[in-house]
Each structure stands twice: as structure tokens, then as C-alpha cells.
Amino acid sequence: MRYKTQGVCSREISFEVKDNKLTNVQFVGGGSGNTQGLSRLIEGMDIDEAITRLDGIHCGPRPTSCPDQLARALKQYKEQ
């Protein structure tokens, strides 16, 4: 799935889900080290667990963050 982010430095997040587990998570743009680290940490994680852990994280004064945007993308995926 591809998700266009809003309000953060990254422009897009792509990921796949196999057996309710996250795989191939990639961010386009944003802080390279942070987004690579996040992608590696959540590889193989259950999507519901990822949503619980990432939902609502802020980045400085912004009301969202790259992790929060990923949680939103996963929620959208589940609604399909």
C-alpha cells in the first residue's frame, strides 16, 4: 500500500502486510536515519501492535509525526 503523508517531512509511506504482519516498510523523504530505524524496528510486527505503539506521536510542535502517519496508514489499510 502507498500512503501520502500530511504534515510531516516524509512525503509517502509504502508497506506490505502478510498474515497481519508488516513488511517492506519504506518512507520517501524525511529524516533518513529515523525513518530507516523505524522501518527496521517494526518489520514483522503485527499491524494492531504497530498502531497501538505509534498512534498519537508528535514531532516537535507538529500534531503528527512519521510514526503517527504510519499508524494512520495502517488504520486506512484495515478499513479497506
Per-range role (PLM):
Residues 4-12, 17, 21-80:
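Active-site- and interface-proximal helix/loop "cap" or "latch" segments in soluble metabolic
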